[in-house]
């Protein structure tokens, strides 16, 4: 009795499985698959983008180096302007110093001439009859006028033996007008006349 029931159960299971297989075959039969399409599905490869050999690669080190190079070029391009401005300033200072030096040298170049702090020029001469004491000749606007005043006084005192600033002009010019107010020109002339009383020298017609 038990064996009959077991066999009937097995038959029922087999029939059920067969029905499922038939249904599945019929369902798949409804689809018409192209053989080439199905084979192509197995041949599809995953698309991986290839990197071009010339494409740039973002390297942090190369980016930093490029930035430093650009900064160095910009600083080097601006440095000539700074150097040119500093060199111009140094040149101006050198020119000013050279001009001041030339003015001082020119003022000292003439015998018996001293430059005043305010820019004018004083002329004076030493009197050999008074142990080399100085005789003030006046203050003049230019060093040349002061030098001519000295030459006139020296020519009166020492004659042609005098050492002059302008020896070729001896006796040609009168002494320039004194621009100072400390002493009158007549007083200076009288003092020179007194100092040359013991000497015989020709008078200065033009200085």
Curated annotation (Swiss-Prot):
Key word Transcription regulation present: yes
InterPro entries attached to this UniProt entry: AP2/ERF_dom, AP2/ERF_dom_sf, DNA-bd_dom_sf, ERF_plant
DNA-binding region, residue range(s): 109-167
GO cellular component: nucleus
UniProt region (Disordered), positions on chain: 70-101, 171-207
Nucleus recorded as keyword: yes
One GO BP: response to stress
UniProt superkingdom: Eukaryota
Pfam family, one: AP2
Major subcellular location class: nucleus
Molecular functions per Gene Ontology: DNA-binding transcription factor activity; transcription cis-regulatory region binding
Positions with biased composition (Low complexity): 74-87, 197-207
PROSITE patterns: AP2_ERF
Cited CDD domains: AP2
Cellular location(s): Nucleus
Keywords of this entry: Activator, DNA-binding, Ethylene signaling pathway, Nucleus, Transcription, Transcription regulation
Family statement drawn from the similarity comment of this UniProt entry: Belongs to the AP2/ERF transcription factor family. ERF subfamily.
Function of the protein: Probably acts as a transcriptional activator. Binds to the GCC-box pathogenesis-related promoter element. May be involved in the regulation of gene expression by stress factors and by components of stress signal transduction pathways.
Protein's name according to its UniProt entry: Ethylene-responsive transcription factor ERF106
């Amino acid at each position: 009795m038990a064996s009959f029931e077991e066999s009937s159960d097995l038959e029922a299971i087999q029939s059920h499985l067969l029905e499922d297989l038939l249904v599945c075959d019929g369902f798949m039969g409804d689809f018409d698959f192209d053989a080439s399409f199905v084979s192509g599905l197995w041949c599809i490869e995953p698309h991986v983008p290839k990197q071009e050999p010339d494409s740039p690669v973002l390297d942090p080190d190369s980016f930093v180096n490029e930035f430093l190079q650009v900064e160095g070029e910009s600083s080097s391009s601006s440095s000539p302007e700074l150097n040119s401005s500093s060199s111009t300033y140094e040149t101006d200072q050198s020119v000013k110093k050279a001009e001041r030096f030339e003015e001082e040298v020119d003022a000292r170049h003439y015998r018996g001439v001293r430059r005043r702090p305010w820019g004018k020029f004083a002329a004076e001469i030493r009197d050999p009859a008074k142990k080399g004491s100085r005789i003030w000749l006046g203050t003049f606007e230019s060093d040349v006028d002061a030098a001519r005043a000295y030459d006139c006084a020296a020519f009166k005192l020492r004659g042609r033996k005098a050492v002059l600033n302008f020896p070729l002009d001896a006796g040609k010019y009168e002494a320039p007008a004194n621009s100072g107010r400390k002493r009158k020109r007549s007083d200076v002339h009288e003092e020179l006349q007194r100092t040359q009383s013991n000497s015989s020298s020709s008078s200065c017609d033009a200085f």
